Design a protein with these regions (language model features):
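Acidic, metal-coordinating catalytic segment for phosphate/diphosphate chemistry
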Residues: 2-33
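Nudix hydrolase/Nudix homology domain
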Residues: 52-53, 130-186
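Unchanged
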Residues: 61-84, 92-153
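Conserved beta-strand residues within beta-sheet cores
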Residues: 31-33, 82-85
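Conserved Nudix-box catalytic region and its N-terminal flanking loop in Nudix hydrolases
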Residues: 38-78
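A generic fold-level signal
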Residues: 24-29, 38, 48, 107-109, ...
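Conserved positions in beta-strands of structured domains
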Residues: 35-37, 86-89
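Active-site beta-strand termini and strand-to-loop segments that position acidic
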Residues: 36-39, 117
């Protein structure tokens, strides 16, 4: 088998040369969030040093890192707790026009995976050790109060993920809005 020359035919079946095909693809960031609740059904939100709005635990996916690995890493870095991540609650496409990003970042848009971090009891909550310099603290917030505590798209995403957890079905979102109706509750 021969390898096509650089810039030659694309071995993946398109009529475009490989370089042109690669350049035509969308460039997006990949991020993760983790939905953690307490036994009263309140959602863990972080007070961070770099924004006024609160956030779910999470962050960016590093190069060559799987989203589940990134979620586990972020929970450990931000909360000091080791957590196995496996269940996806939501996948959200965040447009490049989302307000709040410094123009210097050249924000291209983002795909954010929201994972289920489980329901934590008092012992798990007591083990939280917020990362100094980044996380000022954490609070468990009633779901109805999320829109007042978070940026609009983040609140919509968190609430959609919470709904997905209770209906046993992941949801696909665009800018925090479900693109299909959620499955019926069982």
């Amino acid at each position: 088998m021969t390898t096509p020359p650089p810039g030659g035919p694309n071995p993946h079946g398109t009529a475009m040369p490989a370089a042109a095909y690669g350049a035509s693809r969308a460039t997006l960031w990949t991020g993760v969030s983790v939905l953690i609740t307490d036994t009263a059904g309140r959602i863990l939100l972080q007070r961070v040093t770099y924004r006024t709005a609160r956030l779910l635990p999470g962050g960016g996916v590093d190069p060559k890192e799987a989203p589940t690995e990134a979620a586990a890493r972020e929970v450990f870095e931000e909360l000091g707790v080791r957590l196995r991540i496996s269940w996806t609650l939501a996948v959200d496409w965040v447009p490049s026009t989302t307000p709040g990003f410094d123009p210097g970042t050249c924000f291209p848009g983002e795909i954010i995976y929201v994972f289920d971090g489980g329901t934590w009891d008092g012992e798990q909550i007591a083990a939280i050790r917020p990362r100094q310099g980044e996380i000022e603290g954490v609070d468990f917030v009633d779901p109805v109060d999320l829109p007042a505590q978070m940026a609009p798209g983040n609140a919509r995403r968190a609430l959609a993920a919470l709904h997905a957890r209770t209906t046993d079905g992941a949801v696909t979102l665009e800018d925090g809005y479900p693109i299909t109706p959620p499955p019926p509750a069982s």
